[in-house]
């Protein structure tokens, strides 16, 4: 069973997908949107159907002290809309603290040019979010 990972943002949403066995996460795409939340909801719904996803992991931003700020509240609203749109999935909030930092470091180490970073940073962050969840499930090769 595949699991979808989401790095939610105000203008871009990074998407990652697990392998069929649920061991590894791979970058899938970035959904670009501005004000119409229907755009990402529709695309995520299509991906859930296309890949047979039953569980969606959404990166949940917390402050370093563990409190929930404005971005966290927006993410909760998005999760609520996602659950209303797609009834038969489990949506899990996953602590995303420092995932963007890790994604930027990965891109630096890979030598990805600054002009291309914006295109993939959200996907890489989604991979870190999803892989963290998958690793917590304790599957061993």
UniProtKB/Swiss-Prot annotation:
This is Putative pre-16S rRNA nuclease. Keywords: Cytoplasm, Hydrolase, Nuclease, Ribosome biogenesis. One of its GO terms (molecular function) is nuclease activity. Pfam families: RuvX. GO terms for biological process: rRNA 5'-end processing. The keyword Hydrolase applies. It is found in: Cytoplasm. InterPro entries: RNaseH-like_sf, YqgF, YqgF/RNaseH-like_dom, YqgF/RNaseH-like_dom_sf.
């Amino acid at each position: 069973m595949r699991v979808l990972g989401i790095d939610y943002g105000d203008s871009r949403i990074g998407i990652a997908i697990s392998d069929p066995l649920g061991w590894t996460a791979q970058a899938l795409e970035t959904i670009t949107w501005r004000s119409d939340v229907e755009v990402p909801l529709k695309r995520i719904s299509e991906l859930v159907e296309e890949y047979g996803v039953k569980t969606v992991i959404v990166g949940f931003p917390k402050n370093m002290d563990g409190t929930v700020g404005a971005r966290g509240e927006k993410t909760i609203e998005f999760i609520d809309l996602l659950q209303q749109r797609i009834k038969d999935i489990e949506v899990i909030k996953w602590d995303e603290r420092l995932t963007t930092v890790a994604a930027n470091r990965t891109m630096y180490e890979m030598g990805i040019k600054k002009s291309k970073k914006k295109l993939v940073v959200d996907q890489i962050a989604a991979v870190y979010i999803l892989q963290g969840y998958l690793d917590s499930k304790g599957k061993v090769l």
